């Protein structure tokens, strides 16, 4: 007695990977996500490899996971993959105490983010354009 299978929310030529609890603000993560939106998967990996942003390592891991999901779970051709969507969501925000002068206190916010990457297989001639 297992639950009935859900319908697939993505198209047949798409695969998805999600990275949760990334310890960075959504605003900073979105700067890196903008780099790879709409790019070929190989070019996006190269961009992330040489990015100077700290979070680019985690974005690269998530993109590699999406590529692996496309290849292994959905039988898509890795060479024709394009980053169709890369979007960022809010995670939880840890609030911490910071001692200030004269017996006062301040708040330190430690935000977390979520990253979703969807790769799509496109035709070879469309990917070259």
Curated annotation (Swiss-Prot):
SUPFAM superfamilies associated with the record: Ribosomal protein L22 (SSF54843)
One Pfam family per UniProt: Ribosomal_L22
UniProt GO cellular component terms: cytosolic large ribosomal subunit
Transmembrane segments: none
Keywords annotated in UniProt: Ribonucleoprotein, Ribosomal protein, RNA-binding, rRNA-binding
Biological process, per Gene Ontology: translation
Flavoprotein keyword on record: no
Record GO terms (molecular function): rRNA binding; structural constituent of ribosome
Superkingdom in the source lineage: Bacteria
Keyword RNA-binding recorded: yes
NCBIfam families, A to Z: rplV_bact
Family: Belongs to the universal ribosomal protein uL22 family.
Complexes and interactors: Part of the 50S ribosomal subunit.
Function: This protein binds specifically to 23S rRNA; its binding is stimulated by other ribosomal proteins, e.g. L4, L17, and L20. It is important during the early stages of 50S assembly. It makes multiple contacts with different domains of the 23S rRNA in the assembled 50S subunit and ribosome. The globular domain of the protein is located near the polypeptide exit tunnel on the outside of the subunit, while an extended beta-hairpin is found that lines the wall of the exit tunnel in the center of the 70S ribosome.
Name of the protein described by the UniProt record: Large ribosomal subunit protein uL22
Organism: Bradyrhizobium diazoefficiens (strain JCM 10833 / BCRC 13528 / IAM 13628 / NBRC 14792 / USDA 110)
């Amino acid at each position: 007695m297992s639950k009935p299978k859900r319908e697939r929310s993505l198209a047949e030529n798409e695969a998805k990977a999600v990275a949760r609890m990334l310890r960075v603000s959504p605003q900073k993560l979105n700067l890196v996500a903008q780099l790879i939106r709409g790019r070929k998967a190989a070019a996006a990996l190269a961009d992330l490899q040489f990015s100077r942003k700290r979070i680019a390592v985690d974005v690269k891991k998530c993109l590699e996971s999406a590529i692996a999901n496309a290849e292994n779970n959905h039988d898509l051709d890795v060479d024709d993959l394009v980053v169709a969507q890369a979007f960022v969501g809010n995670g939880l925000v840890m609030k911490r105490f910071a001692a200030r002068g004269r017996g006062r206190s301040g708040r330190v916010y430690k935000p977390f983010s979520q990253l979703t990457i969807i790769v799509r297989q496109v035709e070879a001639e469309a990917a070259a354009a």
